[in-house]
Structure formats: C-alpha cells, structure tokens
C-alpha cells in the first residue's frame, strides 16, 4: 500500500523534478512534454536551482520551480502554478526573456544565444482551447511560419485533463495523470513503462520521505 504526496504541492514538485540525484525524472518529463525524439532528445541536464529543503516552514526557496540546461545549452523553465498569479502571461514572458538575454554580455554574441523553453503546469483554466496540452510559439500570423524558433511555451492545464488509468495513451497523458492524481492513488498504475516516470512515482511515495522533508511539505 503506497500513499503518494500531492505532486502539485510546492515542496513536492521541486523535490521530485528538481532532484539532483534523480535527473532521469526531469529528463523524461522534458522529452515527453516537448515531444523531443531522436537527436533532439535531452540526454543530460544541469539543474540551475537544485531542490533544497526550505529553512523555515512555509518559505518558498526559489521564484521558479525548476530551471535547467541541457548539453546543447538549451534552457528549460518548469513551473507548477496552483493559482493564477496576477499578470500571469507577463510573468511567463519575463522569466523566459530574462533567461534568454542573460546568456550573453554584449550584442556581438547574438549567434551564441540558445533556445529557452517554458513549461507551465496550471491548476486553473487559462486558454480557450479544449485540449489540456497547448503549444505556443512566435509565428507569422498569415502563414503560420515559425520564424523565431528560440522561444517556445508549452502548457498543461490540469482542469482539462480527465482521463482514467485505462485511457492513458501517450507518455504526456501518463505524466499529467501523475501530477494531477498521484495523491489519490494507492498504487502505481500498471502501464507505467517509462524509467523517469517510475522514478517519479517512487520519489512521490510517502514512505521515501524523511520526517524533515515531509514536515516541509505539510507546512508549505
């Protein structure tokens, strides 16, 4: 009998996805949500803000939940938003462009700039579309051509995701199910064959949490 923490919780989310010792979790998640395959797959990540237990109960230790770069120098920002903050859209653009501009010091170095991808997991409805997963990029409004490929945004809207265990088809379905429903489960679903997702369930199992970490989770 396994009980899982609420993955949407601030401490839980960062402990699972920002875990220095379990990078396979973040790597699998990024590849799934961004649909990266073959040569484009993320193979290794460097966490720019690895998870640390808050020093004080209820303290938020970082503004952004997870920031990482891969071996190609691409930056990934992953955020779990339980409630819609004021100026949400501007906040997303602010952190994405800050990470983009922050890569170089002088204007001569433009060719060195590497892409920044933002993944937002939202526990509220934000976009008009019905699909729980949406992709946003800078496009030519007439032709749909994506001329500025370095900034990409993916959003998972949990309220629009209502699939049951037997309906989980894609790996993104399975990750979204984990984030939304893990706390309600007694055991890991049967059809989980992805190494990173298996590790994520293990990491979310309450019996793998120290007293100190669990206290931080409860009080966050």
Feature roles, as predicted:
Residues 1-220:
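Elongated, amphipathic alpha-helical interaction scaffolds
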